[in-house]
């Protein structure tokens, strides 16, 4: 299968995709950003706690 045929098939499949509308896209975007921020803060706190624990053990 050549690259041209592959790209044509990709184009056909992309036409079948149902893309989200404005409000739905905004809701999904806010959900993703909120989730990323939550997990970033969560893992930063966990990392900080483990760092402090290791410092207590080492010293």
Swiss-Prot record:
Protein species of origin: Bacillus licheniformis
NCBIfam families (alphabetical): secE_bact
Family: Belongs to the SecE/SEC61-gamma family.
Gene this chain is encoded by: secE
Identification of the protein by name: Protein translocase subunit SecE
Function: Essential subunit of the Sec protein translocation channel SecYEG. Clamps together the 2 halves of SecY. May contact the channel plug during translocation.
Disulfides per UniProt: none
UniProt cross-references to InterPro entries, sorted A to Z: SecE_bac (IPR005807), SecE_sf (IPR038379), Translocase_SecE/Sec61-g (IPR001901)
A GO term for molecular function: protein transmembrane transporter activity
Assembly with partners or alone: Component of the Sec protein translocase complex. Heterotrimer consisting of SecY, SecE and SecG subunits. The heterotrimers can form oligomers, although 1 heterotrimer is thought to be able to translocate proteins. Interacts with the ribosome. Interacts with SecDF, and other proteins may be involved. Interacts with SecA.
Cellular component, GO, one term: plasma membrane
Entry membrane topology: Single-pass membrane protein
Pfam families: SecE (PF00584)
GO BP of this protein: intracellular protein transmembrane transport; protein secretion; protein targeting; protein transport by the Sec complex
Parts of the chain that traverse the membrane: 30-50
Keywords carried by this UniProt record: Cell membrane, Membrane, Protein transport, Translocation, Transmembrane, Transmembrane helix, Transport
Major localisation: membrane
Gene3D superfamilies: Preprotein translocase secy subunit
Location of the protein in the cell: Cell membrane
């Amino acid at each position: 299968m050549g690259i041209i045929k592959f790209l044509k098939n990709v184009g056909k499949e992309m036409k079948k995709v149902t893309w989200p509308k404005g409000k739905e896209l905004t809701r999904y975007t806010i959900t993703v950003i909120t989730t990323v921020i939550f997990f970033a803060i969560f893992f930063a706190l966990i990392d900080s706690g483990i760092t402090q624990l290791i410092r207590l053990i080492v010293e």
